[in-house]
Amino acid sequence: MDKEVLTLVNMLNDKYVHVYKDEHNNIIVDGTIIIFDKEYDEFPVKIHKVNGSINWYGHISSDPCGSLKSLKNFPDIVTGNVYIFNNPKLTSLDGCPKEIYGSLICDHCNISDISGIASKINNNFIASNNPISDISALENITVGGNIELIDTPWANAHKNDIKNASIIAEKNIQETIFD
């Protein structure tokens, strides 16, 4: 087995996920990747495509302690959702997949920089409970669903004066502040 493929197979340790290289030598993952607070702070090898979703959870407790700190080596394409929860070392979306067929959900991390966001998200972009204060990166992307920035500095600062899009901005209240 190829060394890069073996490295990823050992990391994932999931018999329901198939990892292989395509005819262009790109790493492809068939199946949903689920990572629960392992010692990894990023994927160890570059993945081209995941035919499924990525769920990278920090430790589910009152203390956020997830180990993910970089989206380096994340796939270029994800045919499902990308869900990153409770990873306070993650501060940026640099390395984010370029195209996500489902939703991108980054909740309870420490993301302040979204400039590396995917160019196309077919469903929702949710980045609640992060210190995001600048959303100008959203001007050049396609989001097929809602954008939710609940309990972020940006949402709190703009909840009364924003018009013309569909963003939910107030914690615990689904108030559409754009038309």
Language-model-derived ranges and their functions:
Residues F85-N86, D107, S128, I150:
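Per-repeat beta-strand-to-loop junction in leucine-rich repeat
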